[in-house]
Amino acid sequence: MEALRTEERAVRDWWGRLGLPGLVDIHTHFLPPPVMAKVRAQFDAAGPLIGRPWPLHYRDTDDVLVETLRSFGVARFTALAYAHKPGMADWLNQWAAEFADRVPEALVCGTFFPEESAAAYVAARLDTIEVFKIHVQVGNFSPLDLLLDETWGLVAEAGTPVVIHAGSGPVPAAYTGPGPVGELLSRHPRLRLVIAHLGAPEYAEFLALAESHERVHLDTTMAFTDFFSEMGGVFPAELSPRLRDLGLGGKVLLGSDFPNIPYPYLHQLESLRRLELGDDWLRAVAHDNARALLGPPKTM
């Protein structure tokens, strides 16, 4: 408990020194308890889509984890869920809506999966969902699947951000990589995508997509951390000037993967600071860019 209190003070000091009112984290996970239990079991077993031991640093009930984020001063965060089989997505969307109802700081999140009903259940919730999440690796589907074409069109028209895990880390899968995402954007150029993990390990290619598409953003989830670097996700130093420009241009957002991380939350923040891209960049990434993308918070 004392270690957590020390971390709370350090996290608040991190953003307080920047003159920020708190943090906005675009990439956190809250799931129905049976689903979260299965996710944790995969991490504990270092499952095939993980590729290495992954000792979870935070493991508790939703109520405790929400209070942890509040104690850190995370003013807004997501409850990202993702479907890995048909018939699952809308159930997750209902659960996420109920979670956001009882947690004022939580953005209303949703997901979808290539299935005949996708466009209908997305359309039914499009007025309320604030962020979607798609996991190409875990879902093992192509974002170009024709069953999703109408859904992508609806989401593009609405302008709702979609956090998409499409990079080939930590373990590549059949449909990961920048190619399918580039083709998706050629079909739906108005899509507002947030590339999870900066697209690791295909950093250069995904940075290029953000540079060439007005509505494509990147999140920092696990990037630059010691753990990620040990997995082969070292961010190339020569890309730092481009990363700086994208961050100052509103395109890079703080993400953490909390609570499913194998190190303290503070380490993600310290990893950003040691890039030495400047306080203006840190302010933009940790708060201002997400605030601009998401709009004002709901009344609490």
Residue ranges and their predicted role:
Residues 1-26, 33-76, 248-253, 262-300:
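Mid-to-C-terminal alpha-helical segments outside catalytic/metal-binding sites
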Residues 3-6, 131, 141-253:
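Catalytic pocket-lining loop regions of alpha/beta-barrel enzymes
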Residues 5, 75-76, 84-176:
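Active-site gating/metal-coordination segments in enzymes
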Residues 20-22, 73-77, 102-108, 127-130, ...:
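Short, well-ordered coil/turn segments that N-cap beta-strands
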Residues 27, 69, 96, 125, ...:
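Conserved, mostly hydrophobic/aromatic
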Residues 28-30, 81, 110-114, 134-136, ...:
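A cross-domain feature marking catalytic cores of carbohydrate-active enzymes
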Residues 29-34, 84-87, 115-117, 168-174, ...:
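Active-site environment of divalent metal-dependent phosphoester hydrolases
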Residues 64-68, 92-99, 120-125, 147-151, ...:
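A general structural detector for well-ordered alpha-helical segments in enzyme core domains, enriched
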